[in-house]
């Protein structure tokens, strides 16, 4: 299995902040319910976040925006900054609102922002480093997920992030002017929504915390 951090990724995150939005663990990844009991699902979601933050933190400063105390504690333990999610209950677009709040918080000191999904357990720091380097050549860009419909990462260099995560987000980001990056970064594209996604990521190789949480051999 691959580890949570890279095999010596060259730092490329100067002037870049990574922001990750995480909902309450009890409400996250409900499509994994067929294979995990509620408490076990929360454990897996938290493990995926830890592996994602660990990989990202090897490249750039990370801010996690969340209302969940356990997610906040885990992020702080990895050296990430934590922002209490200001999104009110019942907000029609909670994920993008949380990302905009995190963007506003980091823009005071960092000109460039990457919005990263928090469920990328196979992510390698080298992949994120290479994607950031590619993104520097244009103001706004994104990396699609392995299905081609979602977005794993959105990059904004000197311009507003304008996140449009949600159903068909790849097309929504494309229509908003973001350029799709086509590099070979499999771990950056394997976000987890369904049991099939998790199986595919495990075949690719997940980080140590996710491997432990799902009972995979390490």
From Swiss-Prot:
Keyword Coiled coil: no
An example Gene Ontology molecular-function term: phospholactate guanylyltransferase activity
Biochemical pathway: Cofactor biosynthesis; coenzyme F420 biosynthesis
Listed GO biological process terms: F420-0 metabolic process
Binding annotation for phosphoenolpyruvate: 151, 166, 169
Gene3D superfamilies assigned: Spore Coat Polysaccharide Biosynthesis Protein SpsA, Chain A (3.90.550.10)
Its biological purpose: Guanylyltransferase that catalyzes the activation of phosphoenolpyruvate (PEP) as enolpyruvoyl-2-diphospho-5'-guanosine, via the condensation of PEP with GTP. It is involved in the biosynthesis of coenzyme F420, a hydride carrier cofactor.
Protein name, per record: Phosphoenolpyruvate guanylyltransferase
Source organism of this protein record: Mycobacterium sp. (strain KMS)
Lineage: Bacteria, Bacillati, Actinomycetota, Actinomycetes, Mycobacteriales
């Amino acid at each position: 299995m691959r580890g949570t951090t890279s095999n010596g990724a060259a730092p490329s995150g100067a002037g870049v902040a990574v922001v990750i939005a995480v909902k309450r663990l009890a409400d996250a990844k409900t499509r994994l319910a067929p294979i995990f009991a509620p408490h076990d699902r929360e454990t897996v979601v938290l493990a995926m976040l830890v592996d994602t933050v660990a990989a990202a933190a090897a490249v750039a400063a990370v801010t996690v925006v969340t209302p969940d105390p356990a997610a906040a504690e885990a992020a702080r333990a990895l050296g990430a900054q934590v922002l209490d999610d200001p999104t009110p209950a019942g907000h029609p677009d909670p994920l993008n609102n949380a990302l905009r709040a995190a963007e506003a918080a980091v823009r005071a000191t960092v000109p460039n922002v990457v919005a990263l999904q928090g469920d990328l357990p196979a992510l390698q720091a080298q992949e994120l480093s290479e994607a950031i380097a590619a993104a520097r050549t244009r103001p706004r860009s994104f990396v699609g997920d392995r299905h081609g419909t979602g977005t794993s990462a959105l990059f904004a260099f000197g311009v507003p992030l304008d996140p449009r995560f949600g159903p068909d987000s790849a097309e929504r980001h494309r229509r908003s002017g973001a350029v799709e990056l086509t590099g070979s970064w499999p771990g950056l594209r394997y976000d987890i929504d369904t049991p099939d996604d998790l199986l595919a990521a495990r075949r690719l190789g997940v980080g140590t915390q996710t491997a432990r949480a799902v009972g995979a051999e390490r």
